[in-house]
Amino acid sequence: MAKDKYIEIKGARANNLKNINVKIPQGKFVAITGVSGSGKSSLAFDTLYAEGQRRYVESLSSYARQFLGRMSKPECDFIKGLPPAIAIEQKVISRNPRSTVGTSTEIYEYLRLLYARIGKTISPISGQEVKRHTTEDILACTRQYSKGTKFVILAPLHIVEGRSLSKQLEMYIQEGYARILVKNEFIRIEDFLDKANSGEMLSPEVSMRDLLEASDEKFKKLMTETGMEIFLVIDRSSVSEEKDDISRLMDSAETAFYEGDGACRLLFLPSKIAYDFSTRFEADGMTFEEPSDNMFAFNSPLGACPTCEGYGSVIGIDEKLVIPNTSLSVYDGCVVCWRGEKMGMWLKEFIRRAEPYNFPIFKPYFELSQKEKDWLWHGLPSEKNREPHDRVSIDEFFRMVKENQYKIQYRVMLSRFRGKTICPDCHGTRLKKEANYVKIGGKSITELVEMSITNLKIWFTKLELTEHEKCVSKRLLAEITNRLQFLLDVGLGYLTLNRLSNSLSGGESQRINLTTNLGSSLVGSVYILDEPSIGLHSRDTARLIKVLRELQQLGNTVVVVEHDEEIMRAADYLIDIGPDAGRLGGQLVYAGPASEYSTTDKEAQQKLLEKYPDSYTIKYLTHHEKIETPTSHRAWNRFIEIKGARMNNLRGIDVKLPLNVFTVVTGVSGSGKSSLIKGILFPAMRRHLDLVADAPGEHLGLEGDVNAIKHVEFVDQNPIGKSSRSNPATYLKAYDAIRSLFANQPLSKQMGFTPAYFSFNAEGGRCEECKGAGYVTIEMQFMADLVLQCEACKGKRFKHDIHEVQYGGKNINDVLNMTVNEAIEFFADEKNQHNNGDFDSCRVIVSRLRPLQEVGLGYIKLGQNSSTLSGGENQRVKLAFFIGKEDQEPTLFIFDEPTTGLHFHDIKRLLHAFNALIERGHSLVVIEHNLDVIKCADYIIDLGPEGGDKGGNLVVAGTPEEVMQCKKSLTGLFLTQLLDKK
C-alpha cells in the first residue's frame, strides 16, 4: 500500500505509551485492542482524535477559537495523513430534559417537515379534511352534477363595521344585488325591508325591525340565538362546460368569497343540497392553524403545550403514588388514599355509584380498560350532572384535599401523593392540541413517536401516498427510513422516538450517535469509536458490524477500541497494545491484517505466536489461551423469588434467583433485564433491609429466602469518589494505614506529625495553595478553564517538611505515585520494617491492596485521581473493596455489564474474583451479554424473546446446558455456536 494511504503516528507517548510508531491503513475498518489499561484509549483518543480535533480548531478563526478552549498538541513526534477526526464515545448524548431519541437522530426534524408539507388537517368534530378553498374547488364541485343542473352561488351576509343590517342591504341594492336567502326561502331585498318595517316578528322574542337595526356584533348574536342564516344571492346558473359559463362561474365565486368575507355556499336546486367553501383555514365553525414545521416543535413556543411548556410532565398527583400496586383491584384498595375509616367512605360511595355501569371492582387495576380508569380518576358519566362537592372520583378527592390544605393533615397527605405526572392537557405528547389535528395516513405525529422503531419502519413501508405527495416528500421519506433502518441495524428497534436521551445507557447513546453520523453521510473522515458493542446481545453484533462497514464504505476510516471477538475478526486490520496494563503496557505487541490471525492452519498459528509472543489477543484469537468452560455448576436450594414483575415491558413474570451461586441475567437489548434487576430487585431488597431506596418497579412482592441476605450492593461503573481528591488507596482504606505508618516514623514523632498531617483532605500537612489536589484551576471566562500544576508544591500535594519523612527511602508522594503492584512489593519487603508498628501497618496495607491485584488493577497508581479511571476500572475497584472486606455476612452483589472495557485476559481475572466472593458465602447476580461470562454461570435467566413490546417474558431459566436446549432462546443459540467453535 502506498505511503500516503496510511495514517502514520510517530513516537506516541501519551500516558503510558512507550514512544511507539503505528501505521493505520486509511479507508479501512481497524480494531485497537489490548488488556484494560494497556494504552488503547491513549492511542485512539488522546493521540489520534486529539490531534485531529486540534488541527480542526487551529483552522478556525481566532474569534471562534476563544469559545472552543485551548487544544494542546498530543504527546508524539508527528502524525501524517490524518483526515478530520470524529469521536463517538460511551457518553449520554444530552442532559437536556427535552432531548429525545427522535431529536438526537434528527428523525424528528424530518418528521416535522413531512407533516408540514403533506400533513392533512382533520376536523375533530366532523372528521373531514380542513383546507383553504379556491374557485377551482367550486368548479370541481359543480362537475359532480349532470349538465343543466341548476345551482345558486351564495355569500353569508356580512355587515361592514359601523353599519346596520338595514344600511348593508341598501348598499347591496345599490351594487346591483336583488335577492337574499332567509330560512331557506329566496326573497327580494326590497320585500324583506318592507316586511321588517311593517313590524313582522322573526321569532316570538325578536322582531325583524330589531334585526334591521342590529350592528355587526348584535346581528351575529341574534343569528346565533334564533339559529337563522341569511345569505346574499350572488348568481344563479346551471352546470355547463361552455367556456363563457365557466368564466362566469369563476367570477361569481370570486365575488361570493369577497362579499362573504372569505366564505361561500353552493346550493343545488331543486334538491337544496348545500356545499360550504372558505378561503380561510376553517371547518365546522372552528378556525384551524395551518401546518408549519414549528407547529410540531416542542422546543418552540409555537408548538409546545402551553401547560407543560414542552416537557410532557407537570408537578401534580402522581398515579404511581396513588396506586402503587396495580395488581390490586378497586375493591381490594388499590387506591391508597381511600384507605382507612374516614377516607374509606369515598371508596364505598364510588363502588355504590359504579354498580349501574358494571364497573369491574374486583378486576386488578392493570387490567382495567382506559375508559374504566378514566371513570375512576375523572368521574362516572352520571357525575357530570352533580354538584362539584357531590362528585366521587380520585380527581375530586384531591380537589377536596386542596381545599382543606390549611389543615396540617391534609397538607401532609397532598405532599405524599405529589410528584411528576403526565401533563393533563397534552397527555405527555408535549405538543399543543392543534398539532394532533394534522395527520398522515390517519396518524398524528404524536402517535408515530410513541411507536417502537421496528413498528414505525413497517408503518412507513406500508404508507400509501398520492403521486403529488410522493413527489413532495421523496427526500424526506428517504432520510427518515434510512435513519430508522440504521437504528434497527444497531439493535435499537425496541426504542421509541419520544424516549428521553438522558434515560439511555452509555451504549445506547453511543449507537444513537453512530446512526446520527451515518445519516450525515460524511466522507473522508476517521471515525473513532469506544466499544460500540457495549449493551449488545450477540444477535445484534453482526448488524453492528454491517453498520460500521457501511460507514467505512462511504470512504471513511473506522477505528474501534474493542474487546468483542466477532468485531476483531470482522476488522480489516488489528492493532494490539500491551502486553499488560499501566507501566507494563504501552507497547505495540501486534499490528497486522485479519487474514493473519483468522487462519485455522496450526503451523501458521504457531509462527504467529512465536512472532508476537507478548500479544494476549493473538493467544486468545488462536485459542491457545481461553476462558475455560466449567464442567459442573454449584447446586442451590435457597432462592429469592420476584413475583408478578410488570415494570416497563415485563409481563407479570415470576423469577427465581438462586442464592450462593453465580446467576447471569441475559436477553437482547430492551428485553427487560435492567427493569427486573435494577428497577425491582435492588430497590425492593434495600427496602426489605430497611435502607433508603427509590420506589421499586411494579411487582407483587419478594418471596423465598429473603432473610438469608443481610446486605445488598449494586456495583456500578460510576466514579468511586465524589471528591476530586479521592483515589483507589483512600477508597480501599489502605491510605489510613499508610498515614499511620508515616506518622509512626521517628521524624514524625519528633516533629509532632499525626496521621492527619499526611491527609490531603485536612489542614496541617497538605499544601494550602492547592488544598492537597496538586493542581490549581484558573477560570478563563470565555475560554476553557486552565488546569495547571501547583507552583507551591510542584504537584506533590504536601508541604516540604512532610516530604522529609520517609519510610524505606520513600516519602508520602513517592508512595502515592507507586502502582498497586509496586506498593505491594514495597510494603511486603521486611527489610523496611523496623518495629512492630511498621509490621502491623504494612500487613494491613498489603491485605487491602491485594484485592486490586486480584481483579487485574495492579497497574493503577495508589494516588491516581478517581476521575481518570474508566467505568470498568471504577467497577473493579469497588469489587476489590468488597473482596477485601473482612466481615462475612451474606451479601447479594448486583453487577451491570462488568465486562465493559475488559479484554479476554481481564475477564478471566474477573471470573476468579467473582468465584472468590461466592466462596465467602455471597450471592452474585450479573446482567451480561458476554458469552464467556454466560457460559461460566451456575444459573441463567434469559428474558425476551425480543426487545421492547416483544420482550418482557421469561424465555428460559436454568443451567447453561438447559438454556442451550431451549430453541426459543437466542442466548442459547449463540452459546451453542460458541462452544461448538471451541
Task: Name these PLM-found stretches.
Residues 1-982:
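Conserved phosphate-binding elements of NTP-dependent enzyme cores
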